[in-house]
Amino acid sequence: MFNKTPEQQQAIRNTIKLKMEGRETLTMSDIKTICPAVSTPSPSPELRKKLGITDRYVHVPTTQVIEDIQKLGWNPIEACQVNARKRKGYQRHMIKFVNPDFIVEGRDEYPELLLSNSHDGTTSFTLDVGIFRLICSNGMVIKTQDFGSMKVRHYGYDFEAIKSAVTELMQSIPGYLKQVEEMKQQKLEKDQMLDFARKAAMLRFAKTNEESIEKIVDLSDFLESTRKEDDGDGLWEVFNRIQEKVVNGKFQYAFGKKERKARPVKGFKQQVKLNQDLWELASSYVPEAVVAG
């Protein structure tokens, strides 16, 4: 990239962006171009001191983990990193993977793996499971009591460590897909839909309460469908309508008399957390007897 003109560099980035929008497999060169933090070299002693990285921290480039996950059948399709000044090159970043074996013809949903990491000594490698929905090109991240994120430490990292984490998550995927089917079967009453919308809005506006939130957002607007596939009173449809608006900012809100258009949640860490909390909220509307089955 460094021997390219600015115009050529932008053209390369645009091509990679189109690949990500089409959910095509990214090359390592693609990933390094849009997410340079994946290949940052081990910090020098001086930089370790400046960033507060302890001597116990063992540097494992994310590129190595990406290659290891690919060996397990998962292809990288998206990459991003947070903006940073002080920790530039060592900041948090995320890679998203899909496995062709889990893409079933005729099914609208399939799982994703989300790998997040940083090279500043503040985080372990973290793997989350997501569900991608073809209808709206929207992704959600799962959070349940039974299965959580998998963390792999830098210290003592080897292929078997990531293989074990990925294998354990893969074993949980059928259970997640079963939860999706249970949500599709669960119908909600009008008051339950409003309750869902209210609690979801409070996740987006964390400093609100049940009394104040309805002065900020129109809950009925949260429940409006933007596509026919999301029509209906099923929990899955209601969840998808609300999730898309809360995460992508497709709603109006007001503090006082001034009305504003909500913006999408930008940071991937915030996106993952909000998606996980929304999934947990949706799961609470499935009767325990159904979940246990």
Please provide the spans of the model-predicted regions:
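Intrinsically disordered, low-complexity regions enriched in serine/threonine
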Residues: 1-23, 101-293
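Charged, often glycine-rich, active-site loop that binds/positions anionic groups
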Residues: 86-102
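Generic structural hydrophobic/aromatic packing signal, biased to beta-strands
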Residues: 79, 95-97, 115
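N-terminal low-complexity, intrinsically disordered segments
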Residues: 1-91, 195, 201, 292
